[in-house]
Amino acid sequence: MAYKIRKINRNVERRDYTKVSMNLSLPNLIGIQTETFEWFKTKGIQEVLDEFFPILSFDGSSVLTLENWGFKEPRLSVRQAREESKIYDAPIYANLKLSVNKTEEIQKEFDGVDQEDTLKVLTHWLEEKTGNGNITFKQQSQNSYFFEITIKKSEKPDLIQIDIIEDKKTSLICNVSIYKSGEVFLGDFPLMTEAGTFIINGSQKVIVSQLVRSPGAYFNKELNRKTGEMIYFADIIPSRGTWLEYETDSKKIGSDAINPLYVKIDKSRKTTATSLLLAFGISKDDILNIFDNDEVLVETLQQDSIIGDFKIDWSNQVQEIYKKIRQGETATSEGASKFINSILFDKRKYDLTKAGRFKLKQKLSIKNRILNKVIAEDILDANNNVLIAKDTEVTKNNIQEISKILDQDVMSIDLKYLSDIPGNRKVQKIRVYKDSELKTDTTCLIGLTNSSNEEFITVADILSTVSYLLNLKYNIGEIDDIDNLGNRRVRTVGELLQNQFRMGLNRIDKNVKEKLATSDLYKVKTSTIINAKPLTAIIGEFFNLSQLSQFMDQINPLSELTNKRRLTALGPGGLSRDRAGLEVRDVHPSHYGRICPIETPEGPNIGLINNLSTYARVNEYGFITTPYRKVINGIIQNDQVEYLTADQEKNFIIAQSNVNQDENGKILDEIIVSRFNGDDYMAKVEEIHYIDVSPKQIVSVATSGIPFLENDDANRALMGANMQRQAVPLIKPESPIVATGIEFEAARDSGEAIVAKEDAIVKYVDSKTIITDGESGIRTYILSDYERSNNGTSLTQSPIVKVGDVVKKGEIIADGPSMDQGELAIGQNVVVAFSTYNGYNFEDAIVMSERIVIDDRFTSIHIDEYTLEVRNTKQGQEEVTREIPNMSEQAKRHLDAEGIVAIGTEVKVGDVLVGKVTPKGQVQLSPEDKLLHAIFGEKSRNVKDNSLRVPNGGEGIVQSIKRFKAKSALNPDGIELPADIIEVIKVYVVQKRKIQEGDKMSGRHGNKGIISRILPIEDMPHLEDGTPVDIILNPQGVPSRMNIGQILEIHLGMAAKKLNQKVITPVFEGLNEKELEEIMAEAGMTNYGKVTLIDGQTGEPFDKPIAVGVMYMLKLSHMVDDKIHARNVGPYSLITQQPLGGKAQNGGQRFGEMEVWALEAYGAAHTLREILTIKSDDIKGRSKTYEAIVRSKRIPEPGIPESFNVLSKEIMGLGFNMYMIDETGEKSAINAYDKKDFEIDNYDDEILIKTDNLYIDDQDVDAEFEDLTYVDENDILNSFELDNEEE
């Protein structure tokens, strides 16, 4: 039997056709979010605080130290933050201690104080100095006096110690030490929810991880086409700080030519590499000794003006380098040296990070450069014992042992340079033969010792880099591939937040130093020394404005999960879309098991936005690792799983997971397809080091949800993976008959399901709560009920356990949207026939049966949120009311007494949801008006209707209303709102959308299409047994697209449906052809799954048998209700006066260049003229035409389009005068509209321009026709020079 029955959970079991039995269970799929944020909270913040504290004042007399810090409880719960549109955050507090040390001269002459009574003198002086009378003397020890100053009973008292140094006749010379401590607020910090998201202003946001170039040393070479010489390059790149770029010169030509070595410091002008070493205080002789008189360095030193006096040489080189970096500036030798040291060796300015140090040690240590080389000297230990003999060749077999010896820092030499340069002062030096065959000439390798751990650059790093570069021409070392994942690292949420926190503290650090310098330290409070605003501002800016902080894609659980696992190469410090070439976008061999080669966007971001593979993890240095099982002597060690980076992997031979093996893990094949150093390799069993853990480890979660992925063309699989994320949650979710086995894990880790937090027994279940009893006691889970997602879909959770069930930790106890019994269910299983139907499925269109609509198979629920703010304006307070001027009772029929729509009301476009009036400027009332006002009250008030109405396409049923009133003395239970807002009202309107013509659907194989026709059930073709077909797809959509997976899916789906089974066929290891034939035979299917279909309209059978089966189809979020749009009169662009575009702007359809060609081809001159003038931007013409139509008059002649005026003004701007000449040769004016034709009335933030000289005052304009334009206030004020009256 080729399958086994697998129990997915308590409710679901499937036939599992998995071939590789040793599949590793998947890691936590959102671990890249939750684990790194946990690191940030526990270690990341501490690291940054350790960098900045203690803070010293400029003069060194005061020091601010950090005693401890921590988060306090969040002020709001996650649910409250979402409902009130707030941030889910927690305050950070730190306990700080300020120590001040000062020398003071204290005068003895105080009125009424005995000069001999020192204690009284000191107490009196302290009272004056601190302005505080609560001073308590604690004790005296010889000449030291100890005092306590109480500020508040709730706070710790300040301690002051006064040591008398000298007792003069009229004064005391004292050393005063002040110790203040207190709790300081460092700001509110957003917290991550359990689902890996942040709640920012009520919306769920995700911080996307960024894939960037790792700090480290990189080497390259290229041919100079002019001279034919090879140029070698080396870059030392930090995470933050100065770049060092080395390159060899190529001016001298010939086999004997030796070119010098140059360096650029931070993109400045070139200087010789040796001048930098001389500037560090390494003498010329030491340089030559370290490098064994290397010919390139000898040549380079000749470029430096060296006279032999160390001090003078050092001074000249330091100043020379300073001039190159700071062009046009001069400095003393000491100043220049200090500057160079500060930009390279100061931790604050130069940050290599742990990852950078790891990469430098990996690249520049000798053990990684000597493979396939012959050692040219005995390698000795400290006692001169030979560890590795001369002439030993380093091979794959002995490299591990030699590496262990070199790790003991043998053959290291001490470096002599300036004492004020920090860092490791040892390098390793070993000689090897330039040519392993001839063994004549030797070259020395300088490498880092194992003890180098600094997170800044050291002189040892610079010497090792120079050595590496000099030896590249002897093929010692290798050129770097920048696109290799060993050279790119992931900045996860934790690191990105840590960087922001560091920037915030950097600003606080500057402010604190200024405060310590300017404040009276006797009176200052610890709690006021730090102002947290710079930190909270930077954090807020990051969450609200950063390219990496994204509004979470929440169409369905899969899109949410994918968003959290996304990697982007864009963003600050990354690439830009325009500059990224093909190489960086391409699939690289090192992506295997780390980044999915299939799931990436189509379009300008292709290859720049990627997704983590299923098993991939990010290690402590930010490099992506993937798991492999160890293989020893041809036997797979199932219990030894190792996570390797791309760099570690390249030295091993790795087999694919689908090898033949026995029950003990012994590999049965003799020759195995494997990978070595990024290439395919046919290996013998005994050569294998590792084996993949699973065939699906190379693809992402979404891609591994495509059954028969191996039978689909990659382009279509890419579309399939992307479209699964766009599937709308349906009201009756149905898990796929043909699944891949990832559905349970994807649903569990998405954050939308409710997962048991511990082993427990279910005590109570209803539609809103589940109560369990476990080790930690009674636990209540609250379920969401018709909550709105970020994308307007409905988030509803439904329980799948019953009272008395025993649940395990990590088990799904309530389904979220698009889930069925704990499995991801983003579509429906429908009967599909591949046949044409009267041309209705031309070009991928889909013909559907009405039965699907009636049964609500593809019906989805969508919730729209409409918000109304009640403000306090200059004219007075806005008001929510039912009394709205000039509104009929019919229009107000849905409003209650307060002016708010009732829950459950069915509303249409234009209906009022909330009535609101805004006061206009109050005018002096005449006696008659006052009388009317007294009689009728509200109705005659001078107010404007500003009600909230249902926009186009927003009809539905009012589901809920939320009101948030501002916190005030009268309303202490209110919430914090901006100063001018009194109340916020949110109305939620729910729509039930059945599937209809124009909606987009797809399968999981990139087979997408638009519904073109929904046929009555009786007209649909049906099988001979009467089973009606649900969907007809065009068979021509398969061969050229090469997504054959869909054909295999319909056959397997049909067979499984007939057998009443559900199946699992994982990617790359699912059913093969033979097994598919077996299950089809078991289900009684013949003729390769093709059947005779009967035409529903004629009752006749079709001529040829047709492929019919069950396919999992998805309804995508591109629905015709959101796209359909019409316009009659609407807004116009301010400059060209042409109608705006797009549905959001209520714009028109563009009649573009190609459409103009069509009319030109027909010779339709009058139609064309009309379209280009009165239907577009002939301002007067379009008003006159509207008037003519309304009054049934003749359509006037078109005038001059505004675009022509814009063009003529642009030509005038170039200095050409343009005018028109009539038939007689006379100049005539071009009729352009004049700004006098416009009156401007200021309406809040928008300005209404009304044309046709309509006069506007505070009263409503009574005009039969008017042309309205909504534009931005600033634009118009800039465009027309308005004086104050007009404005």
From Swiss-Prot:
- One biological process term in Gene Ontology: DNA-templated transcription
UniProt key word Acetylation: no
Q: What class of enzyme is it?
A: transferase
Name one molecular function that GO assigns to this entry: ribonucleoside binding
Q: Tell me where on the tree of life, at the top rank, the source sits.
A: Bacteria
Task: Name the CDD domains for this protein.
Answer: RNA_pol_B_RPB2 (cd00653)
Keywords on this record? DNA-directed RNA polymerase, Nucleotidyltransferase, Transcription, Transferase
The region annotated as signal peptide is none
Entry-linked Pfam families? RNA_pol_Rpb2_1, RNA_pol_Rpb2_2, RNA_pol_Rpb2_3, RNA_pol_Rpb2_45, RNA_pol_Rpb2_6, RNA_pol_Rpb2_7
Among PROSITE patterns, the record links this protein to: RNA_POL_BETA
Q: Show the catalytic activity.
A: RNA(n) + a ribonucleoside 5'-triphosphate = RNA(n+1) + diphosphate
InterPro entries in the record, alphabetically?
DNA-dir_RNA_pol_bsu_ext_1_sf, DNA-dir_RNA_pol_bsu_external_1, DNA-dir_RNA_pol_su2, DNA-dir_RNAP_su2_dom, DNA-dir_RNAP_su2_hyb_sf, RNA_pol_bsu_bac, RNA_pol_bsu_CS, RNA_pol_bsu_protrusion
> Which EC number(s) does the record attach to this protein?
2.7.7.6
Per the record, GO CC terms? Answer: DNA-directed RNA polymerase complex
Question: Which family does the UniProt entry place this protein in?
Answer: Belongs to the RNA polymerase beta chain family.
Give a short account of what the protein does: DNA-dependent RNA polymerase catalyzes the transcription of DNA into RNA using the four ribonucleoside triphosphates as substrates.
Subunit structure, interactors included: The RNAP catalytic core consists of 2 alpha, 1 beta, 1 beta' and 1 omega subunit. When a sigma factor is associated with the core the holoenzyme is formed, which can initiate transcription.
Q: What is this protein called?
A: DNA-directed RNA polymerase subunit beta
Annotated organism of origin = Mycoplasma capricolum subsp. capricolum (strain California kid / ATCC 27343 / NCTC 10154)
* UniProt lineage: Bacteria, Bacillati, Mycoplasmatota, Mollicutes, Mycoplasmataceae
Annotated gene: rpoB
